[in-house]
Amino acid sequence: MGKSDFLSPKAIANRIKSKGLQKLRWYCQMCQKQCRDENGFKCHCMSESHQRQLLLASENPQQFMDYFSEEFRNDFLELLRRRFGTKRVHNNIVYNEYISHREHIHMNATQWETLTDFTKWLGREGLCKVDETPKGWYIQYIDRDPETIRRQLELEKKKKQDLDDEEKTAKFIEEQVRRGLEGKEQETPVFTELSRENEEEKVTFNLNKGAGGSAGATTSKSSSLGPSALKLLGSAASGKRKESSQSSAQPAKKKKSALDEIMELEEEKKRTARTDAWLQPGIVVKIITKKLGEKYHKKKGVVKEVIDRYTAVVKMTDSGDRLKLDQTHLETVIPAPGKRVLVLNGGYRGNEGTLESINEKAFSATIVIETGPLKGRRVEGIQYEDISKLA
């Protein structure tokens, strides 16, 4: 019987079978060969190439098992990290997706006999969080990427700094209130009983300066105060007001108010605050990655849109192409002196300015703020990565 034609149903079926997954028991991990049926697998086991691979493996079987185990672990964790991230997922779901790849490492070639043993091993090694439920074992990937850990530490540091600033502000306000209360002498009124020797005599009140706030009831034959006493009382009250106004005006000149000091603290905090996301719409950036080819390497473009703080849609200036890039693949562009720039980080973030000069040795620049409440302020020593040219 002749060989089947290329477009015959049998040939087409054979090509479809060769591309798909076959039975696990007919796969040889040492030779990395998949057989279609039992007869083919038997013939492969009797072949010279298979016998040669078995001789090599028999010399150092532990080395081959360690190699397959490491490859299986790396591929499994890479799939778990990329596909599911840090979500809690059933281990069988991840395994089924892993074995759907035709060139995967089979578990029977590794040091783990079952998926449960492999799951427990991941938990013991601290690579994943594992827990057993009535429905089976669940795993959760632990992200130990240095970049992710750095971002988490920066976020925790920023939260701690905000809490410290709030505590300092509250403590400062309490201190100001305490100082204000200490400056005032709390007067306690003294009460005395009214004594009258003669019921027919009229009662008068002595309002002299030496009375000190206590009303002493005395008996006298006079029925009213004379005009001289009223003048004395008015002059004494006016003198007190002048003294109190002068004494309150002097510390106001020496000390700043609580509101002014709080505003200075907030301005200082904003000036020193930095973020890891610096992309802003409307700035000119340069592509520094070579993954896109030489066509876009070292080429400039304008940021049209910022997605999730760290991704930008860049329109190339020469070709007009639109590319979606991460900020790690971009860098800022420093224009010539006299051109307009945008501050991307630090206390002046979001303000536009004019580039005055460049210090090439210190990799810094001097700009003049053109917008906002700090318009006209001259800022020295601002880093290259904190400013970029405006489109």
Curated annotation (Swiss-Prot):
What residue spans carry the region label Disordered? 206-258
Identify the keywords attached in UniProt to this record, alphabetized. Answer: Coiled coil, Cytoplasm, DNA damage, DNA recombination, DNA repair, DNA replication, DNA-binding, Metal-binding, Methylation, mRNA processing, Nucleus, RNA-binding, Stress response, Zinc, Zinc-finger
Q: What else is known?
A: Recognized by antibodies directed against the RecA protein.
Show the stretches that span the lipid bilayer: none
Q: Name one GO molecular function term.
A: zinc ion binding
Please tell me in which tissues this protein is expressed. Answer: Highly expressed in transformed mouse AtT20 neuroendocrine cells. Expressed at a lower level in testis, kidney, skeletal muscle, liver, lung, spleen, brain and heart and kidney. In testis, expressed at much higher levels in proliferating cells than in differentiating cells. Not detected in embryo.
Native organism is Mus musculus
Sorted alphabetically, which SMART domains does this protein's record hold?
A: Kin17_mid (SM01253)
Please state which protein family the record places this protein in. Belongs to the KIN17 family.
Protein name from the UniProt record: DNA/RNA-binding protein KIN17
Compartments where found: Nucleus; Cytoplasm
Q: Which residues carry this modification: N6,N6,N6-trimethyllysine?
A: K135
Main location per the UniProt record = nucleus
The domain-related comment in the record is: The C-terminal domain (268-393) is organized into 2 subdomains that bear structural similarities to SH3-like domains. Both subdomains adopt a similar 5-stranded beta-barrel-like fold and are connected to each other by a short linker of 5 residues. The 5 beta-sheets are packed at approximately right angles against each other. A highly conserved groove formed at the interface between the 2 subdomains, comprised of Lys residues 302 and 391 and other positively charged residues, may possibly be the site of RNA-binding.
Example GO CC term: the record gives: nucleus
> Would the keyword DNA damage turn up in this protein's UniProt record?
yes
**UniProt modified residues of type N6-methyllysine:** K135
C2H2-type zinc finger span:
28-50
What are the coiled-coil residue ranges?
147-180, 252-275
Gene from which the chain derives:
Kin
InterPro entries assigned = C2H2-Znf_KIN17, DNA/RNA-bd_Kin17_WH-like_dom, KIN17-like, KIN17_WH-like_sf, KN17_SH3, KOW_KIN17, Rib_uL2_dom2, Znf_C2H2_sf
In this chain, the stretch annotated as C-terminal subdomain B covers 338-389
Q: Assembly and partners?
A: Associated with DNA polymerase alpha, RFC1 and cyclin A, in multiprotein DNA replication complexes. Also associates with replication origins at the G1/S phase boundary and throughout the S phase in vivo.
What job does the chain carry out?
Answer: Involved in DNA replication and the cellular response to DNA damage. May participate in DNA replication factories and create a bridge between DNA replication and repair mediated by high molecular weight complexes. May play a role in illegitimate recombination and regulation of gene expression. May participate in mRNA processing. Binds, in vitro, to double-stranded DNA. Also shown to bind preferentially to curved DNA in vitro and in vivo. Binds via its C-terminal domain to RNA in vitro.
